[in-house]
Amino acid sequence: MQIATGKLSGGGRPSEDRILTANDATLVVVLDGVSTLTDDTPRGGWYAQTLGEEFIAVHDRAQHLDLRTTLQEALTRVAGEHGLVPGASPAATAAIVRQRSHDHMVDALVLCDTPVVIEKHDGFEVLRDERLETLVRLSPHRDVMVEQLRAGGGFAGPEHRRVVQQLREHQMQHINQVGDPLAYWVAEATPAAARYAVVRSWPISDIKRMWVMTDGALAGIESYGLWSWAAFADACTAVGPQQVVDAIHAYEHDDDPSGVKHPRYKVSDDKALACIDFRPTA
């Protein structure tokens, strides 16, 4: 695995996105930290960093474990060591790619809206967890937000801040709730959430490249349409992932600073992008 990364804060504060890799470059962990509604100081970045480091530590000790079990163990340890309580803990989305050298397989895990994109010899595949997106799409608050932004209300006004707060509160009612048909699952102080992660495995011979990205980077392709997946793949190779996330950020600020074209929560979200190349080096 050859790994290249790009990261960028959405602006005005440190990024809460994280990319971590194992020392032997066979494991990539990408997380999008989420602070609680009541945090005076944002803790999402701290949580993402701490969980990512713990995941790698658990993996290094027990590489035979599947990714769900490894994540569950890491969640248990972080919650226990730091006294985190469900519903009042910072959280993180997570996406993980692991190369298993002993049997020439590649594993991927996705929990919440941080996808993994796979370029195989016959095309592209996106491994995603759509439960949060489905929940948001069903909320009437989302429709209000879209209408306000398309009408030119912008991101700075009290109306936008109010509806975003309502959306967050709506989401919190359904986070990590067993038996809730609208539940979505995220890394937080409920270790069992790991059992609900989306997982896949492929023979390494089937894969050319993979990309792991937070939703801020994904928006450049699926929301803004700046590239097709094939063009995005070529751009990552030609100019590198840092210039790709820079280009997405520039588009948001230069071409749609008020969210009229593409309604969203804020002008720019944090962005993290890891590019993984499995092709033999020359």
Question: Locations of the language-model features?
Answer:
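PP2C/PPM-type serine/threonine phosphatase catalytic domain
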Residues: M1-A282
